[in-house]
Structure formats: C-alpha cells, structure tokens
C-alpha cells in the first residue's frame, strides 16, 4: 500500500467517528505510533510504498468504534513527554498539564520539596514533577496495580526517580511528611457513585 492509501484508510475511519479537526489528530497519532507513518511523509511522498506494521482493518475498526486514540496508540503526550497508556489507566486531561505547570512555576526555586501524588495513574504528574523539579522527592500512590505498573514503566523510560506505592488513600496516607500534595483523580458521576 502507498502512504496515501494508508492515511486515507485511517483518516476515513476517524472521520466517521470524530469531528474533522479531531479526526485528523486521531489519524496522525495512530498512523505515527502504530504504523510509523507521519503525516508529513504522506504529503512529501504520497505514492511511496509503506510496509504495514499492524493490521490496518483492525486498526480502522478500533478507531471507528470510538476507542480513544491514546489507547489505540498506547501512549499520550503530557507536558512534552510521551507516556505509555493502556486501558485501566485514565488519559490525562489538558487541564492536568496546567496544574503541573502551575506547580513547577511556583516551586521551581524550592529545594528538597517533598511531593505526594495521589491516584497517580500513568504517573504523568509525578514523573513530570520529578523531571521539572530535580531536587524534589516525589512519592506517588495508586490503588491500581495496572496503574502502578504503567507509572513505573514511564518513570524508568523517562529516567526519573519516583517512589511508587500501592495504597488506598482512604485508609491512610503513606509514611512521611509532604510539602505538597497533588491529585487529579477521575471524575465520578452521581450514577457511578450509586453503583
């Protein structure tokens, strides 16, 4: 298949499920990560052959079934870094990046800051704070083994030191004192609370 044919297939599936701007972003994310095909490559050499690294029809089906692109790609971008993701770990929201940027701006000159991230998920908050505030000691907790596995993987891949701990925060905080506690837990609707 050519680059253009692959792009058209992926974009067509995304366009059936998303608004045009979002469809392009979804197609670009999935093509680049899962197929190794950047949109600029499609523009520059649309007729160049492109070997497939994935089953294109299955990929198109996943996109068309409204599965989030970040789960299809297996990653998300957060504060300029690439974080592994999989189902069972929530996709960080743009406002979470704003929260992290605000913390970094306010505490950039603080030395030895002790930070606790509650409900770390993918580890994006904890790992980014460890990277941006290198003198900080960051602890991250989550109740989910899946989340902790992904968060540890992200910290290792991005070469950041974060202490991860499995903990239900409702049963008590981790040992130690903290200068800053940060959390951006998932939103729970009233109907979900009743379940």
Task: Identify the meaning behind each predicted range.
Residues 1-47:
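Non-catalytic accessory regions of SAM-dependent methyltransferases
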Residues 6, 26, 55, 95-98, ...:
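Charged catalytic carboxylate motif
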Residues 13, 17, 59-63, 187:
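Residues that form generic nucleotide/phosphate-binding pockets
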Residues 21-25, 72, 93, 141:
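Non-catalytic, surface-exposed connector residues within folded enzymatic/regulatory domains
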Residues 32-105:
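Conserved AdoMet
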Residues 95-194:
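Conserved SAM/SAH cofactor-binding pocket of Class I
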């Amino acid at each position: 298949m050519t680059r253009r044919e692959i792009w058209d297939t992926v974009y067509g599936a995304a366009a059936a499920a998303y608004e045009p701007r979002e469809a392009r972003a979804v197609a670009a994310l999935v093509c680049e990560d899962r197929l190794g095909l950047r949109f600029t490559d499609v523009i520059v050499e649309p007729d160049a052959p492109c070997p497939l690294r994935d089953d294109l029809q299955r990929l198109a089906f996943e996109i068309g079934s409204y599965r989030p692109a970040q789960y299809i790609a297996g990653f998300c971008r957060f504060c300029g870094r690439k974080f592994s993701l999989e189902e069972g770990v929530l996709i960080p929201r743009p406002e979470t990046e704003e929260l992290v940027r605000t913390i970094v701006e306010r505490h950039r000159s603080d030395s030895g800051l002790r930070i606790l991230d509650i409900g770390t998920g993918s580890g994006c908050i904890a790992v980014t704070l460890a990277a941006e505030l290198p003198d900080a000691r960051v602890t991250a907790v989550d109740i989910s083994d899946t989340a902790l596995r992904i968060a540890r993987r992200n910290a290792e891949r991005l070469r950041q030191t974060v202490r991860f701990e499995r903990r239900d925060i409702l049963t008590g905080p981790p040992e130690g004192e903290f200068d800053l506690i940060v959390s951006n837990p998932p939103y729970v609707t009233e109907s979900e609370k009743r379940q």
